[in-house]
A protein has these predicted regions:
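Soluble catalytic domains of enzymes that build or remodel membrane lipids, polysaccharides, and related
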Residues: 1-150
Length: 150
């Protein structure tokens, strides 16, 4: 199953660039790294580039922010020089008892975690997966203020 062509058309018309294992240098100040979605092997994103490969060659003096659907590969991102990983995916378990068991599946299931020099932020998001309901979790939009040092 590939991405919905209507989505592709919308993204193109809106001039949105999807970063599928791609890097953008923003204003020569910091990097945005978009990862392919590991959960969607049928949409053409099965073969993801490993963190050490996608981050190699980047100027590590500049902040590196990784955008990822799932909070995966924290250790690999940290050892490869990423400064921050921003994720969704977990919905913080969405419904009881998932909100209790999700913490067994992910090192950072929801919230903030510092792993070495990597700052990982995972939101429960505003959407749902499967049934359109939440029990025992909250929807959230997480405002983040980043101050670059150095």
């Amino acid at each position: 199953e590939m991405r919905d062509p209507r989505f592709e058309e919308f993204v193109k018309k809106a001039k949105i660039r999807i970063l599928d294992d791609e890097v953008m240098l923003i204003d020569d100040a910091f990097y945005l790294v978009g990862r392919k979605d590991a959960q969607k092997p049928g949409d053409g994103t099965k073969n993801r580039i490993e963190p050490e490969v996608i981050l190699s060659g980047l100027d590590k003096a500049k902040p590196i922010i990784v955008l990822e659907h799932q909070p995966k590969q924290l250790k690999e991102l940290e050892t490869s020089g990423a400064d921050m990983q921003l994720c969704g995916h977990t919905h913080d378990g969405q419904m009881f008892p998932g909100n209790l068991t999700v913490k067994l599946m992910w090192e950072n299931a929801c919230g903030y975690l510092k792993k070495g020099n990597l700052h990982s932020i995972v939101t429960s998001g505003v959407g749902v997966w499967g049934p359109a309901m939440r029990v025992g979790t909250d929807c959230e939009i997480c405002p983040i203020t980043i101050h670059f040092q150095g």
